[in-house]
């Protein structure tokens, strides 16, 4: 086979022939005007075919010069307005009174045959080996695509079979041999998009800037959720580029509906997954009508804000949708959404950022035709003014469906849009008054998604929970799953985000406490241990020790990153911890003469040692014109603000590309919280590295949390979906307590419905029920009250999931919520002042693993079903001696024992020989075996000698897989150090 056949010629010809067979025509070299970078033949052929009458009037004015004059007007128009805008506007001439369209788009035409006929007469032409220079030996582009004589797309092809890749040779060719100063390559004056592709991967850019040209991946994603493309039987993996994207209809849609110039002057071309998600949603609504639910699982780095904006634009143009509402709970995203919506649509007044009065929103909802961008906090005040209108249809786009966006107010938002009454909205407030902090309130409030016949929901999230999946997921043969997905793995491999787990260091804390005084009082054991842990972890010794570790690490090893701009974030477990760290860190920075500062982020006021602290007061050094700045402005505007201390703030919705380092001193006890928190590091920057130091969390658990959202399938199996009939069982179980009857419930509901909540009849009835309640044993009273509360949550959740509203069950949900408020005896336990009970006598924190990589893999995962049981927390009462014993067993002495184990086993000659001469897997197994034997010896020794503490320690250690792995790795590291030293 000839060498040229191995290169791109057959590849080029295959694409060329395909496009010619699907609506393109061949361009001719003789028709190309090098000076104006236009195909004159195709330009005027289009005008003759679509606007002949206007062209005749134009000819009558300019005679034989009409072509020259029109080209002048066209070039002037593009020069003033840019090509992208000009394609959607007129080329006008005052002297002749004419105006011409450069192209016809379906969305800009009526559905009459005349309009479609004009659309079909757009001329798409293609040139291969396109010589764009008028020289004897010009540079050539493999393929050039024109629309009505105007160059739109340039394509350079490479073949990996010839040792060339698009990502390397293709991008380099555009960077080095295509002069952006030439008209045809000038930004937004001629060519709009540049592709380079080989058989396996595709990349594009919209601006050539020599070596600064940035190409983005334009790939579908591989079978294993990574970068690249899947195998296509019998075809090139990149065939979608010419078979789908470059097809006439699709390319015109992209130009008209997706491409835009952003606020920074960049021309935006949708990434593949953005285009796919929007079009799939639009097509499904067209096929199945309004009323669907769509879970869009797009990772950080997916460009979610733009995807939401494009989707909102498509939905507001849907003939069956009156109003689009975009809801976000983050001010920064809220603002970005408003800006992006204006960018992608360009119509003033269509995208409305509602932050004024309730009447403003009410008017927009009633008028229809608007995209309303708002937060629930701004949306809520007027919800009860809007009555149901079944003839109006809505699209609700929820940003981060697991967050507080979907909270208690969301249920009321849906009540407004589905037309439920004021009374029902008030009842919802009662039912959901006591939701647990940090949970997905929308998913617990199911009422938010009820009666969706006139509402389509589009829920965007990077970290879907099982409740999110059940409410918004698409049903498949195996259960419910996402509608569209862009994985974390693909985002990382395509370099839109960084992997924040590449460099991870973990520590383990050890504490020993003693009691201060004799005390026989019994305390709630769990609360007492929590109070003690809070007390010891805010002690001066602990705070100063960790401050020393963190800041010495940052100063010695991290502060030079990003040319001295790197910032670090300290994740603290409470506001008090944040205040303590701020004071200690400022003292450390002053003592060591560091040339940078810290800031702190927390809410409210904290009192410490008789002094009151607020975020604003502690950040008083950062002033702008004498006025305190908000925390995000402080961080973004002050390069010397390099240590950011946070307590439940800035862990989501915070973008700072200079954030390279994270020090974690807080338990991250859920996959959503862990991924969101640590992923603050993943924003990209040139030459950026990341580092995590974790004092609290098990690295294996962090790995498991990230693996859930890294890639692979994520679904709720059919057998784990919530059984709606559980409501009947719950109802019967509640009635079996013989506290309230169905007749009682009906009477209570009728009195509430009649607005007679203060009537004597209701009071008497509730008093009778209260008497029955008090007759129960204490444990049964608590269980009964919790069943009442659980019933309401289950009812609204199940009603939302199954889109079935049972009026009888609704009445019970309302009544049971009222009874819960009346009957539930909230336990008031005095605060435990641990400082009066115990003192910290010994503390150390030991390095467990240093600068290792937490390996992630794409694994299919199935959600468990949601719990429908009521679980009352067991309350164990203990005296302080027992509490101290349990605390010390958990946190004390372990460092000495573990240190002895590491020292003894690392000195073992057989193990040293194994590490020196065996494979990694072999010596890891050998060390693990010896470690297990050593632990059994310790357990036996403690048991035989009656050393209960030692026996319990080794028992607990033998069951702690993560600790065993860390100890094994420490032994291996020490052996390697000893071998190296010898």
Predicted regions and their residues:
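Post-DEXD/H (motif II) to motif III coupling segment of the RecA-like Helicase ATP-binding lobe
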Residues: 406-500
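Conserved C-terminal RecA-like helicase domain
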Residues: 533-646
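ATP-dependent helicase/translocase motor core
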Residues: 2-323, 332, 336-348, 377, ...
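Interdomain helical connector at the RecA1-RecA2 junction of SF1/SF2 helicase-like NTPases
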Residues: 232-238, 467-565, 582, 586
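Inter-Walker segment of RecA-like/P-loop motor cores
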Residues: 342-385
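Catalytic cores and motor modules of nucleic-acid processing enzymes
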Residues: 17, 21, 39, 45-51, ...
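Conserved segment of the helicase C-terminal RecA-like domain
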Residues: 680-708
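Conserved RecA-like ASCE ATPase "motif II neighborhood" in helicase/translocase motors
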Residues: 369-415, 422, 435-447, 625-633, ...
